[in-house]
Amino acid sequence: MRFPDCGRKDLKYPEWTPVLKNELSGNVGMLELIRRKDRFIHVPYHSFDSYIRILQEAAINKEVKSIKTTLYRLAKDSKVVKALINAARNGKKVTVVIELLARFDEASNIDWSKKMQDAGIRVIFGVEGLKVHSKITYISMKTGADIACISTGNFHEGNARMYTDYMLMTAAKNVTRDVSLVFDFIERPYSPVRFKELLVSPNEMKQKFSRLINEEIKNKQAGKPAYILIKINHITDPVMVKKLYEASSHGVRIDLLVRGNCSLITGVPGVSDTIRINGIIDRYLEHSRIFIFANGGDEKMFIGSADWMPRNLDNRVEVIAPVYDPEIKADLKRVVEYGLKDTLQGRVVDGTGENRPWISEDKTAFRSQEELYKYYLNENRIKD
């Protein structure tokens, strides 16, 4: 569904052409670039074509044994599916986990499923009793140098032009191993699986997030750096809300970017004094989930598909991945910090429903989406 074109260019936003990152657009293949170091794209500021290139290269690479991916929503003329079909025709073992209960996309997903099955792709229709909402791709290599992509959003070209989403591309063995185990869990539902790196629901995600918050409380009590920064769509899970209140009651600083539903109330004496929440509504739908914990000065960062809602943490297969690369961690921090100081499109989320504009101490105007786009443009010129 797209907004109709009324022929009024003066009512449209100026064009922001997605940046094709120089480091991902040279003669070196995407698979080799990812093997060298972790990579990322932040759509729609960056071009989604980088991910499509991964699939297109994997489809013809003789070292690729198999490709597994989850699909939740698909574009009408999906290059993602076309690349997967090409891979199957080239003899790769391709497995697609597609969610037939993706709201508003049921008919489209059924149609694509038939086309993929006709091409020889193994199609799995989710897990009984759970909705598969994770956004992961796993590419198995004959050499053992496997590759994984973990995204906060759908592998959907249309969404990638309108939703802000983050994608991590990695060859780190501990992470790729865990991603392969997620597919094992989906293929053999409810089998016992232990994940070393990933936070996976409904297995242990809520417990692991709770432990991360507990560490911030301990560090605050020990006089170490302690804070929590989260960018998310919704926070309504009672357990996670109580954990944030508990951390705040111990003096842990908590800064949140929440676009949608939020059960937290800020400024309650002794309960949520140290919590502040900003919400951004702008030209792009804020959709990425980013989690940052001070960890005593050695920050831990994560990205993934899960909001803090009961349905995500208890009734869906969701994946949150750690981020270790210093460059990517710096960018994640920038994204959250820019959002927290957005005075033009940001609004105070305080439980009153007033949606008061966010006003900085120095009263300067700052629009986070525009500033991020400018940053990525300039960064690309510098690295050219």
Question: How does the language model describe each region?
Answer:
Residues 253-257:
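Hydrophobic alpha/beta core scaffold segments
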Residues 233:
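Cofactor-pocket helix-loop regions in the catalytic cores of large enzyme subunits
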Residues 1-228, 246-250, 262-384:
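N-terminal localization/anchoring segments of enzymes in phospholipid and broader phosphate metabolism
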Residues 238-241, 245:
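Glycine/threonine-rich ATP-lid/beta-loop region of ATP-binding domains
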